[in-house]
UniProtKB/Swiss-Prot annotation:
Keywords: Ribonucleoprotein, Ribosomal protein. Belongs to the bacterial ribosomal protein bL33 family. It comes from the Bacteria. GO terms for cellular component: cytosolic large ribosomal subunit. It comes from Blochmanniella floridana. GO terms for biological process: translation. Gene3D superfamilies: Ribosomal protein L33 (2.20.28.120). This is Large ribosomal subunit protein bL33. Signal peptide: none annotated.
Length: 53
């Protein structure tokens, strides 16, 4: 059976309020950490979410 290349990651809010999103990414083709602008429902604004383990 083939080894999975996609891994589940957590994107945590940069405000530190504890909100996070889960997604998957291909670790082989994108080894760097992801930074995305997404909506934070706690503060009701779009902010930067960063990947953490």
């Amino acid at each position: 059976m083939a080894k999975e290349t996609r891994e589940i990651i957590y994107l945590f809010s940069s405000t530190g309020n504890g909100h996070f999103y889960t997604t998957t990414k291909n670790k082989r083709s994108h080894p760097e950490k992801i930074k995305l602008k997404k909506f934070d429902p706690i503060i009701k604004k779009h902010i930067t979410y960063t990947e953490k383990k």
